[in-house]
Regions:
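Catalytic-core segments of nucleotide cyclases and related cyclic-nucleotide turnover enzymes
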Residues: 49-56, 82-83, 97-123, 127
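PAS and PAS-like sensory/regulatory domains
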Residues: 86-91
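Alpha-helical scaffold within the catalytic cores of cyclic-nucleotide enzymes
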Residues: 15-20, 51-80, 112
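Residue-level recognition of strand-loop junctions within catalytic nucleotide-signaling folds
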Residues: 40-45, 67, 97-98
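A short glycine-centered flexible hinge/capping loop motif at secondary-structure junctions
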Residues: 1-8, 33-34, 122-123
Length: 128
């Protein structure tokens, strides 16, 4: 029998690795809860148009990275017993803000609303 918690843990660890590979060192990747993550991009362009373009490039890079197949090794009795291929999609909500413009909670609410718009439009997409 497969250990589902081990599978979930392995998947989350691989997801974090992929997310971190898509952003710069100055950016932040954090697990928000369950299967939700927050990515904060720092020092984007000053103009709204350029910032949106930069964020869109990173969001699409993340979407594609997360869509690639995961091959997860699972153990039984302490030894690798099985490799499972798994595929995920990502619905990504993006919001732009200037430091100090809104509370942390307000920013997360806006990003969450954008994510649900992405899901409503068919999942596996980016929405601003």
């Amino acid at each position: 029998m497969l250990d589902r918690s081990q599978f979930a843990t392995n998947l989350l660890m691989c997801t974090v690795t992929r997310l971190k590979a898509c952003v710069r060192e100055i950016d932040t990747v954090a697990r928000f809860g369950g299967d939700e993550f927050v990515v904060l991009l720092d020092e984007l362009a000053l103009s709204l148009e350029d910032s949106m373009a930069q964020a869109a490039v990173v969001a699409e890079k993340i979407r594609l990275a997360l869509a690639a197949p995961y091959v997860l090794g699972l153990q039984r009795g302490g030894a690798d017993a099985l490799a499972v291929e798994h595929r995920c999609t990502a619905s990504i909500g993006v919001t732009l803000f200037v430091h100090g413009e809104a509370s942390q909670d307000d920013i997360l609410v806006r990003a969450d609303a954008a994510m649900y718009q992405a899901k409503e439009q068919g999942r596996n997409r980016v929405f601003f």
